[in-house]
Amino acid sequence: MTTSVVTLSELLAARVHLGHRFNKWNPKMVSFIYAERNKVHIIDLVQTAFLLGEACDYVKLLAKKGKKFLFVGTRQELNTILAEEAERCNSFYINQRWLGGLLTNWVTIKSRVQALEKKESEGFFNSLPKKESARLKKELDKLRRYFNGIRKMNTLPDVVIIIDQRKDLTAVQECNKLNIPTICIVDTNCNPDIVDLPIPANDDAICSVKLILGKLVDFIKEGQIERELSKTS
C-alpha cells in the first residue's frame, strides 16, 4: 500500500472523524467507530487513512490501465466541488440528480438524449405545435442539465466513486447489479457492506469530502501521467 497518503492531522483538521449522533448509526459501521463523545460517534481515523490509501492505490492502478471513472455526488452543496475534481482528472460525473436506470438502462437513456439533440439541430422542434415543442425542449434541457458531466461517456464506467451513500443509494444499487466496482465514503449511518471499497469518513462536512476527493483525484492523475509516460518510453 502507498504510504503517507494522508496524515491523521490532516484528517482531524478536515473533521473527517465526526460521525452522526449515536441514535442514527448503522450497526454495520461498528468496526469503524473509535468512540462516542457527547452522543456523537467518532470515526477511527487510523482505519480511514488505511482504507483511503487502499482506494488511492486502486484508482492509480486503474488509471494506469486507461480505465474510466464516474464520480457521483448529488447534494447541492457538493455540486461545484465534485465537478471541479472530476474534471481535474478528465473523468465523468453526476452532480445534479441521479435518474433511475442511468446505468442499468444506459443505452436507452443515451439514445434518448442523442435523438432529442439531433431533432433540435435539424429544426424538428420548430415544425411541432408550440405546446409539444416546448415539452420536448424542456425535456432536453433537463437531460442536458442532469447529464452534463457524462455527455462524452460512451460506455459504462469501470469504477464509480460515490460521496453520499444514503443520498445516492440508487447509484450504489445499479453498480452492484452491473458488477461495477464502487468506492464510497461511508459515514456512521451508512452500510459498508454494499460497496466494494468503503472509506469511513464524515460525508456531511465539505472539508472532509474535499480532502478525500482530492486525494483520490491526485492518484488518478498520477496513474494517468504514468500511462502517458509509458507510451513515450
Curated annotation (Swiss-Prot):
Superkingdom of this protein's organism: Eukaryota
Keywords for the protein's UniProt record, in alphabetical order: Chloroplast, Plastid, Ribonucleoprotein, Ribosomal protein
Gene Ontology CC: chloroplast; mitochondrial small ribosomal subunit
Primary location recorded for the protein, binned into one broad class: plastid
Pfam families: Ribosomal_S2
Xref: CDD domains: RPS2
Cross-referenced Gene3D superfamilies: Glucose-6-phosphate isomerase like protein, domain 1, Helix hairpin bin
Xref: InterPro entries: Ribosomal_uS2, Ribosomal_uS2_bac/mit/plastid, Ribosomal_uS2_CS, Ribosomal_uS2_flav_dom_sf
MF (Gene Ontology): structural constituent of ribosome
Biological processes per GO annotation: translation
Record-linked PROSITE patterns: RIBOSOMAL_S2_1, RIBOSOMAL_S2_2
Location relative to the cell: Plastid, Chloroplast
Similarity section: Belongs to the universal ribosomal protein uS2 family.
NCBIfam families: rpsB_bact
Protein name: Small ribosomal subunit protein uS2c
Organism: Galdieria sulphuraria
